[in-house]
Amino acid sequence: MCEQEILHYPLLYISYYFKKYRSEYYDRLQAVRDRRDWEGWLKFFLRAVASVAQEAALTARGIVVMKEEHRQLLQERMGQRAGNSLVLLESLYFRPVFTIDHVKSVTGLTYTNANTLVKDLCEVGVLTEITGQKRNRAFSYAPYLAFFS
């Protein structure tokens, strides 16, 4: 589906499960070769799909809850800048590591106002500056990225 451009990224990362249970993975493959034990392989494979799907569903639910909490926080704390804050927040689900130029492009703000917006979002705990520099800084939506680490 990724090759046909229906999906941009795989929904399930089954190879992680296979790495985690590498020994059983190779044993099941060998059993198919040696004894034609397709049933054992299919049961193992389906357990992998079910396990990874459960983890993906939990991650998705967590992201939805966090997204709503952050939307509420920005509406309550950002005052007149809530609109631009929410526009930026939506863009961060597609680009969680970014620069001020990205903020300018998605909000239409000047560099100074985009910089102030990001500073305020860092202060409320939604964003994190990741370079430690004064110039050419980059920021991340760390709470979102934490779901994938």
Language-model region placement:
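Short acidic, hydrophobic short linear motifs in intrinsically disordered regions
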Residues: L89, F94-T107
